A protein has these predicted regions:
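N-terminal Sec/SRP start-transfer signal
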Residues: 1-28, 41, 345-346
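Short helix-to-coil transition segments within interhelical loops
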Residues: 9, 258-267, 335, 344-346
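Alpha-helical transmembrane segments of integral membrane proteins
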Residues: 18-29, 223-243, 280-284, 288, ...
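Hydrophobic, regular-secondary-structure patches
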Residues: 20, 27-102
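Peri-transmembrane interface segments
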Residues: 36, 200-241, 248-254, 258-259, ...
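Hydrophobic secondary-structure segments that place a key small or acidic residue at a functional site
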Residues: 88-91, 96-111, 116-178
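Mechanotransmission and gating elements of multispan inner-membrane complexes involved in transport
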Residues: 135-137, 145-152, 156-233
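Short helix-loop junctions at transmembrane helix boundaries
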Residues: 271, 281-322, 326-339
Length: 346
């Protein structure tokens, strides 16, 4: 039956090639959508982890520092008792340089928690300096404007974005206090590492994971929309594969009747059709795995296709292909061997 299946694929090569390409386009989009959702979930975790804190001390009543603002007095910082801690400013701003781009501004003490890993250049060492994520399209030595103040870019970091690609920029704490609040007597949060033994009244200690989760909440609607698109793409893939298997079953109905008449079992005949469906699905996924390498970099948002997608997608595709081919398999199973001796194939 394997030989019969391969011969049929060769006989109808053009059709199966077209179906494989169409399926590959659908599976390529599935790879990209999967990578997009993965990036949505990975982005806040990577960004929060890069700040070096295991605990964030925040005012009570806010969901997180990146989704709400409720500054508190710098006097409260002295109450914090932890192995290592440092105050930070978190705020939204716009960077002006050949246009304007929204950013998340982080103000931190020099060489303290909140300072990101540097990929190029050096960390912030004084007011008037800025470290930016490389997605902001600025270079070391550039001068940019934030809230009417000119800052010099001294370093670049990577993978420091939030809320679906909004870049983070980092500056010295007092500089950020002036830019965000025009008040050096307030901070947005206190970052802590290690054991936290005491926090100020009216604040709560939130884990880094909790802060990352809160930063993801504004994207819940977008993630749900992408998930819906993925479901629709799976339906399209099922229709494509199911249609070609059903047409193949109709065209080969008399052949199957002949095979039944000479003693072939339903099991072997159904296996032949199932093999066709599986081969089309696997070839389409294999082609899609290559195509997504070219599509993902051109996508407007960063796409991070997880390693697990390269084994999960083929497995799901095989399952979908078998389900989609059930109609054709049922037609074969119900075919009458007497059809082999009739003058028509219907």
């Amino acid at each position: 039956m394997i030989l019969l299946t391969l011969r049929d694929l060769r006989h109808r090569f053009v059709r199966f090639a077209v179906v494989t390409v169409l399926g590959a386009v659908v599976f390529t989009l599935l790879f990209v959508m999967t990578g997009l959702v993965e990036q949505f979930h990975r982005e806040p975790v990577d960004t929060v982890d890069a700040l070096g804190a295991s605990t964030w001390v925040l005012p009570q009543g806010i969901s997180g520092p990146f989704t709400a603002a409720a500054p508190f007095s710098t006097d409260a910082v002295a109450v914090v008792d932890a192995d290592e801690f440092a105050p930070v400013i978190v705020g939204r701003a716009a960077v002006a340089q050949d246009g304007s781009e929204d950013v998340v501004l982080i103000g931190h003490e020099v060489d303290a928690l909140g300072s990101p890993p540097i990929d190029e250049g050096r960390p912030v060492a004084a007011p008037g300096e800025l470290v930016a994520d490389d997605s902001l399209d600025v270079d070391i030595g550039d001068r940019v404007m934030i809230a009417g103040t000119e800052l010099a870019v001294v370093g670049l970091t990577s993978d420091s974005t939030l809320l679906a690609g909004i870049p983070l920029v980092f500056t010295e704490l007092t500089q950020a206090q002036d830019l965000v609040y025009d008040n050096r007597g307030v901070v947005s949060a206190v970052l802590a590492s290690g054991e936290v033994r005491a926090i100020p009244q009216g604040t709560v200690a939130t884990s880094a994971a909790g802060v990352a989760d809160s930063a993801l909440e504004p994207l819940d609607g977008a993630i749900a929309s992408v998930d819906l698109v993925r479901v629709l793409l799976w339906i399209v893939a099922a229709v494509i594969i199911g249609a070609v298997v059903y047409l193949s079953a109709l065209e080969r109905l008399r052949d199957f009747a002949v095979l039944k008449a000479i003693g072939a079992s339903n099991r072997s005949l159904l296996g032949s059709l199932a093999l066709q469906a599986v081969l089309v699905a696997l070839l389409a996924v294999a082609l899609a795995a290559v195509l997504q390498l070219f599509l993902a970099p051109a996508f407007p948002l960063k796409v991070s296709v997880p390693t697990r997608a390269f084994w999960q997608l083929p497995l799901i595709a095989v399952g979908v292909a078998l389900l989609a081919g059930l109609a054709g398999m049922r037609r074969v199973a119900n075919s009458d061997p007497a059809l082999a001796f009739s003058g028509a194939s219907g």
